[in-house]
Amino acid sequence: MKKIIFLCILALICLTAIIIKNPLKVNKSDLDLRNFDVDLENIDKVMIVAHPDDDMIWGGSHLIDDNYLVVCITCGAREDRVLEFKNVMNATGSKYIMLDYPDKTNGERDNWDTVYSDITKDIERILAMKDWKLIVTHNENGEYGHIHHKMTHSIVKSVYENNYLDKDNLYFFGKYYKADKIDEVKDNLEEISEENYNQKNEIIYKYYTSQKSVADGLSHMFRYENWQKYNVGE
């Protein structure tokens, strides 16, 4: 009997070693990238973000409360980030399109010079998919200054101004404050509900595990989603 138990344990150890050495691979074809054939029934709001995690950090409470199509521009090359994003979309009941444009190239943040026009065309296509009730994206400052956030803002704003100014339905993520400044302004900021805050926090840390350090650095903003409506001429 002891010999059988020993052999079972040995087999389990060997199997574990094989799995660790050769982890399961997800085929890129299974990641559902650039799928524009999305069921948009009961979806009349669209959120456009640069990276997976921007959706929850800047608009998680809205995703929890409402039905959104979330468009993520980058990170299709990172299977871990694709799967994290899909898990978050499932957790919030959101529809999604992941466009698969580069976040980093050769270890450096991509400047989007070679894909800027393609991103613009995709955003044009997405905004034409429905008569959207609400469109939201990054603010002019890119929240804390991220260049991809700024470029996403510019692209969405440009497409909107050229085609949809009469809709009056474009919003930008709320103003970012540094952690050492938040106490000075928080009395003037509207907080999301405690229930949504707890759920938002849980989803971010449960699913966006690769971005824990980013989440830690921005967690002081999790309670605030003071989106600003776009005014023509701004």
Residue ranges of predicted features:
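The feature marks non-catalytic terminal segments
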Residues: F6, A11-C14, D166-E234
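Active-site beta-strand->loop->alpha-helix modules in alpha/beta enzyme cores, enriched
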Residues: K2-D166
